[in-house]
A protein has these predicted regions:
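Active-site-proximal helix/loop segments of hydrolytic enzymes
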Residues: 1-112
């Protein structure tokens, strides 16, 4: 189980992508929320580590294209296993996944 947020940008990188027209380009919508997204990813990853054996408690950073267009705190969650021959065991993770995400979002709402 992996939770992803976008990588942190440096000040020169932010200046290079700042819109000049005052309009927000869709591919840059997430940049104002990177810190909040990272915190949300941390909370969700901790919940996943508590529920699923072998899951790290540290979230990952990756340039996930779909996250760049979200103008709010956002993460991507990857559910997969290379050692599971039968997908039904992954399907059984659903309730634990949903509960963990719900608890993390509830905790995040108190700090957002």
């Amino acid at each position: 189980m992996r939770v992803y947020s976008l990588p942190q940008l440096t000040v020169p990188q932010l200046a290079a992508i700042a819109p000049h027209s005052g309009l927000l380009p869709w591919d840059r919508a997430q940049f104002s929320y990177i810190d909040q997204s990272r915190r949300l990813a941390e909370l969700i990853q901790i919940q996943m580590a508590q529920r699923f054996r072998g899951t790290t408690d540290t979230p990952f950073e990756a340039p996930v294209r779909q996250l760049r267009t979200v103008a709010a705190p956002a993460v991507a969650i990857e559910v997969s296993s290379v050692s599971v021959a039968d997908r039904s065991s992954l399907d059984q993770m659903g309730p634990g996944l949903a509960d963990g995400v719900a608890r993390a979002v509830a905790a995040f709402r108190t700090i957002y």
